[in-house]
């Protein structure tokens, strides 16, 4: 070790010889160039003397210049290439800032409410004192020592603004994002932006239960394959900026003293203020879905950040915001059957039938209800696209946790690039919604990336079971399968982390994972995966019989249908189902006869059972135990 360090220091401090100085031409090379030049001159002069060539056509001066300046040109050329590359990279980078906040109401009473808040210079000046105090609180040192890592509600209520931006105001922050120099490819529905088109398609797909044979008869019109801008998933700063937008969606906005007037907000939905019912005008922001819209300087690219599960809000006063609705939608999207984990659980829908049996039709209808988050996120996108036309604007979607799953569902519906952070598995919800997909689309054209880490139990799909933290908090997070690409940081192997709910926080993802690694995680396709494999999903209003019941070892096997066996003359038995019953005399057949009849091999009842109830011996009523 010391010898190597010594050699390094000696090499560093030794003088540079004259032959190593850049641009110097030592005598050996000068002599070599002189000899070559002399031979070339004599040869060309001889050829010109005999009239074979014309020296003027060769440009001898340029040849000499190239020979003498070869070393000097090579180095500046490489630098020029690097400069050209850097200029190309800089052109791919744009700066984004918050322009709008959309709030869409949910629930039976507020689902028609939809409002927009524009972040203008006048709005920032109006609430300057609030933002000054807000920035000071964000700059304070984070103290998570008293947090119970086994309490999901405590973790959701932690301040989750990343340390890398702790001195910046979330409402005025500017974030650099690079687009990939390689375009993404996509195939989209031609009429996806026509009013009512997607709603009618999803409703019809629900009626036919997503049967591809029936849906293919509709002959949906798909656009030709086109190239679109996608985020650079290999750029660390881009990932940090997108994750920060996801974190920004948790920020609580300033509230006026006279909350009823809401002079800063603009109604963009069907809801109209009801002066007689004050409850609809007060506290409306506590129920619903929120999206923060960041726009590039040239207004050509828009990034929508979908808010995740509350409790992870930043300081700013107010209530727990959308916690109640978030929990209901979590349990609807990511559970096998309405969060029916045990008999003491209160389900979020009435689709449960019996043990490990659920009504599939009921589940699909619940997901498409107008007062649920999927319809809300579709309406939110429609209002964003009304301001920024999709024909001239690139729209990307991002989100954390529940927001990431909703972003994935929205992106798959409209063909938008999506980057989701620590989202629970949304493949099950995608199948239940019967989202439209172009036939034969390859994985690389989905443009959906899920960023996660192996120490997050929610992303990995292991936060379930009777003793899990999610279960104790009332969250049925039973899905593990994602769509699109998975970009997973293996912090358990690389950093020795343990699985903990604190690793689900967006602050941890930004400060301790993305920025801690030298390179971004490799994105791979989702391996074959299936959620809720032990559940039986039924449908009672179709002509196709339901799936057969799962075998029950505690129940005697049914009596088989009688069958007769005949010989084909080659000692091969041929069985055929008979419609008549077998007579008792058929058991005693003539030994000389080629037709042989035997009782069915399947027993009729259980003769012996083990101590835990498994049948160990089957037989008929009149059979006697051989051991007796």
From Swiss-Prot:
The active site is at 401 (charge relay system). The lineage of its organism: Eukaryota, Fungi, Dikarya, Ascomycota, Saccharomycotina. One of its GO terms (cellular component) is multivesicular body membrane. This is Putative lipase ATG15. GO terms for molecular function: phospholipase activity; triacylglycerol lipase activity. The chain crosses the membrane at residues 33-53. It is found in: Endosome, Multivesicular body membrane; Prevacuolar compartment membrane. It comes from the Eukaryota. Lipase which is essential for lysis of subvacuolar cytoplasm to vacuole targeted bodies and intravacuolar autophagic bodies. Involved in the lysis of intravacuolar multivesicular body (MVB) vesicles. The intravacuolar membrane disintegration by ATG15 is critical to life span extension. Keywords: Autophagy, Endosome, Glycoprotein, Hydrolase, Lipid degradation, Lipid metabolism, Membrane, Signal-anchor, Transmembrane, Transmembrane helix. Glycans are attached at residues 261, 299, 383, 518. Residues 1-32 are cytoplasmic. It is a single-pass type II membrane protein. Belongs to the AB hydrolase superfamily. Lipase family. Residues 54-628 are lumenal. Residues 562-586 have a biased composition (Low complexity). Its EC number is 3.1.1.3. Binds to both phosphatidylinositol (PI) and phosphatidylinositol 3,5-bisphosphate (PIP2). Residues 591-600 have a biased composition (Polar residues). It catalyses: a triacylglycerol + H2O = a diacylglycerol + a fatty acid + H(+). InterPro entries: AB_hydrolase_fold (IPR029058), ATG15_Lipase (IPR050805), Fungal_lipase-type (IPR002921). PANTHER family: LIPASE ATG15-RELATED (PTHR47175:SF2). Residues 540-605 are annotated as: Disordered. The keyword Hydrolase applies.
């Amino acid at each position: 070790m010391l010898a190597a360090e010594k050699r390094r220091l000696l090499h560093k401090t030794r003088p540079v010889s004259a032959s190593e100085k850049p641009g110097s031409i030592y005598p050996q090379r000068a002599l070599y160039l002189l000899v070559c030049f002399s031979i070339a001159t004599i040869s060309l002069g001889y050829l010109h003397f005999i009239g074979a060539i014309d020296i003027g056509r060769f440009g001898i001066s340029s040849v000499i210049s190239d020979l003498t300046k070869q070393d000097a040109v090579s180095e500046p050329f490489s630098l020029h290439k690097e400069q050209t590359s850097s200029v190309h990279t800089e052109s791919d980078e744009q700066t984004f800032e918050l322009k709008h906040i959309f709030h869409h109401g949910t629930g039976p009473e507020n689902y028609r409410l939809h409002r927009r808040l524009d972040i203008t210079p006048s709005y920032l000046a109006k609430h300057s004192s609030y933002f000054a105090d807000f920035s000071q609180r964000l700059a304070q040192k984070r103290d998570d020592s008293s947090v119970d890592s086994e309490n999901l509600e405590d973790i959701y209520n932690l301040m989750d603004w990343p340390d890398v931006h702790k001195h910046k105001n979330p409402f005025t922050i500017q974030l650099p994002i690079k687009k990939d120099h390689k375009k993404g490819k996509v195939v989209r529905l031609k009429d996806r932006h026509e009013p009512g088109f997607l709603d009618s398609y999803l409703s019809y797909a629900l009626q036919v239960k997503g049967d591809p044979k029936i849906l293919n008869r509709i002959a949906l019109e798909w656009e030709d394959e086109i190239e679109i801008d996608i985020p650079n998933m290999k750029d660390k700063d881009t990932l940090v900026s997108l994750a920060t937008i996801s974190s920004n969606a948790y920020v609580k906005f300033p509230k006026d003293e006279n909350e009823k007037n809401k002079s800063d907000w603009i109604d963009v939905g069907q809801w109209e203020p009801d002066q007689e019912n004050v409850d609809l005008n007060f506290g409306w922001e506590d129920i619903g879905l929120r999206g923060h819209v960041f726009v590039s300087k040239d207004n050509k690219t828009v990034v929508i950040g979908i808010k995740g599960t509350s409790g992870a809000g930043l300081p700013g006063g107010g209530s727990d915001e959308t916690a109640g609705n978030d929990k209901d939608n979590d349990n609807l999207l990511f559970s096998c059957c309405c969060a029916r984990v045990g008999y003491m659980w209160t389900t979020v829908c009435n689709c449960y039938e019996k043990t490990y049996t659920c009504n599939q039709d009921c589940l699909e209808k619940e997901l498409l209800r107008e007062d649920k988050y999927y319809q809300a996120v579709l309406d939110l996108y429609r209002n964003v696209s009304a301001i920024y036309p999709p024909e001239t604007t690139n729209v990307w979607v991002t989100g954390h946790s529940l927001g990431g799953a909703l972003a994935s569902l929205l992106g798959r519906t409209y063909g938008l690039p999506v980057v989701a952070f620590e989202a629970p598995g949304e493949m099950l919800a995608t199948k239940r919604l019967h989202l439209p997909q172009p036939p034969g689309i390859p994985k690389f054209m989905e443009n959906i990336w899920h960023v996660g880490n192996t120490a997050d139990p929610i992303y990995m799909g292991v936060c379930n079971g009777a003793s899990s933290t999610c279960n104790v908090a009332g969250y049925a997070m039973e899905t593990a399968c994602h769509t699109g690409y998975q970009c997973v940081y293996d912090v358990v192997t690389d950093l020795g982390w343990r699985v903990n709910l604190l690793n689900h926080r967006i602050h941890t993802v930004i400060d301790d994972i993305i920025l801690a690694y030298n390179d971004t995680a490799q994105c791979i396709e989702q391996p074959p995966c299936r959620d809720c494999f032990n559940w039986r999903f039924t449908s009672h209003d179709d002509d196709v019989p339901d799936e057969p019941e799962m075998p029950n070892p505690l129940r005697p096997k049914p009596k088989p249908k009688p069958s007769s066996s005949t010989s084909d003359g080659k000692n091969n038995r041929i069985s055929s189902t008979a419609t008549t019953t077998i007579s008792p005399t058929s058991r005693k057949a003539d030994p000389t006869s080629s037709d042989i009849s035997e009782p069915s091999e399947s027993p009729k009842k259980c003769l012996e059972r083990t101590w835990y109830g498994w049948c160990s011996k089957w037989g008929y009523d009149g059979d006697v135990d051989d051991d007796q």
